[in-house]
Amino acid sequence: EVARFNQAEVTKREQFSKLKADYDQRKSQFEMEVWRRNAEVDEFQTAYRAKEPDAVVAYNEMVLARSEYPTEGFPQKFRIAYSPDSSELIVEYDLPEVQAIPKEAEYRYVKTKDAIESKARKPTEIKQLYQDIVASITLRTLHELFEADQADALALATFNGMVDTHDPASGREVRVPVVSVRAPKMEFLGLRLEKVDKVACLRNLGAQVSNRPDELQAVKPIVEFDMVDKRFIEQGDALSGLEARPN
């Protein structure tokens, strides 16, 4: 009996030692991973504060990615390019289609019919609401970028709002620019956005704003994203640059 008890105790101690060794190894790996991630964050922050183009692009990509919109109908897809020479950020942003606006203005219960009936929106209301959405996203995006510019890396930003849809006349896929604005940061930050008429505000900034975005009436972008010169660093270039940095 004593021998079996002693053997059981030895087995328990061996199991405990193995469990502790496994725990210590996992703890060490976790601490190393935390240290590595913290070092990466510190390195990224240092690069961003130094206005390194790759870091500026990656930072602003994170700013826009964290912007919250409804999940239905709002693509939240975008492309970014940055010129360190002019401190200009160019954003090509995918806007929701007009179908994102519900066709029904309201629902009401009709007691005599014991049914719920809907009231359709008027076409003029849909037009106004959609134009307001386009202008709101444009101003909001510029505001978020400039407000988040902790490194003071941006002197101005260009926003091109695009609609990816199908041409109702041909059925072909089309990509239509419906708003384009180039805004100096200091001028923009002086605006009282809560007081402005959004479309009038954009036009005062020199924006090209479609009168009928609901009908895919296009505008000419102030800067064509695909035509930016080699001084601009784009998202793919920025990621490659950050990954190639020495550890």
For the regions a protein language model found, what residue spans apply to each?
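Long, charge-dense low-complexity segments
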Residues: E1-N247
